[in-house]
């Protein structure tokens, strides 16, 4: 485990418990004051708390507490506030902000996936300046797949629940297209800190998460 990852171990555990407690409280609240749909969302949220741990186990990754913390904060904003609390409808522009954030973070996930799939050199993850555009296009592609996949999920939910999560009745295809567009904008915005890291070695917040992953999983080098 890298020193950077270890420094966030306690904060990661606090975020994990906070997300779980939030889902439990909202499940009880929705049981008495809302609909079965929101009770289901709250209970499902409890399952999502374990997603980072499950992903590590399935992919045989080492524990990276900084990446875990980022995942819990993202789940809280996108799922906890956005879906369980219904923030997408209650808070102006929250939907578009979260889709942009999704583009940024899944661009980061795409970059991590690029080096996870890339053959290691002497058992280590090695980042080369020359492969910036390869990694950048790959990361944006992952974000695009997620954006399209999410819209497919919303379409399927509408077929089952008839709750129009894509707002087709009042916006036509506008909401769906804007969601995908701002997600891609977020993925392209991620290229800025990514380029600074490749060109100048500037780590920053987002690339710090990436570097923590590299060092935690087989001692990455740049």
Walk through the language-model features, giving the residues of each.
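N-terminal membrane topogenic signal
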Residues: 1-19
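Membrane-interface helix caps and helix-loop-helix hairpins in membrane proteins
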Residues: 31-37, 61, 84-94
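Cytoplasmic-side transmembrane-helix entry/capping segments in multi-pass membrane proteins
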Residues: 41-44, 62-74, 96-99
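Interfacial helix-loop-helix junctions of multi-pass membrane proteins
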Residues: 85-86, 90-95, 144-192
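Membrane-interfacial alpha-helical segments at the cytosolic side of multi-pass membrane proteins
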Residues: 103-122, 159-165, 184-197
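Primarily interfacial, aromatic-capped hydrophobic alpha-helices that serve as membrane anchors
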Residues: 132, 174-222
């Amino acid at each position: 485990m890298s020193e950077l990852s270890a420094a966030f171990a306690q904060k990661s555990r606090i975020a994990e418990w906070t997300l779980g407690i939030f889902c439990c409280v909202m499940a009880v609240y929705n049981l008495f004051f809302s609909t079965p749909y929101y009770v289901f969302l709250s209970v499902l949220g409890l399952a999502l708390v374990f997603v980072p741990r499950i992903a590590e186990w399935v992919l045989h990754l080492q524990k990276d507490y900084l990446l875990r913390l980022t995942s819990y904060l993202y789940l809280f904003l996108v799922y906890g506030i956005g879906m369980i609390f219904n923030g997408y409808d209650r808070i102006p522009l929250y939907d578009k902000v979260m889709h942009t954030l999704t583009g940024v973070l899944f661009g980061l996930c795409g970059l991590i996936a690029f080096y996870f799939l890339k053959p290691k050199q002497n058992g280590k993850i090695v980042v080369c300046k020359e492969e910036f555009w390869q990694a950048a296009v790959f990361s944006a592609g992952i974000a695009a797949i997620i954006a399209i996949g999410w819209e497919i999920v919303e379409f399927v939910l509408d077929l089952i629940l008839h709750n129009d999560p894509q707002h087709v009745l009042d916006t036509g295809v506008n909401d769906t297209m804007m969601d995908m567009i701002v997600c891609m904008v977020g993925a392209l915005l991620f290229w800025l800190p990514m380029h600074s890291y490749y060109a100048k070695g500037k780590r920053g917040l987002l690339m710090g998460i990436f570097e923590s992953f590299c060092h935690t999983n087989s001692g990455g080098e740049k």
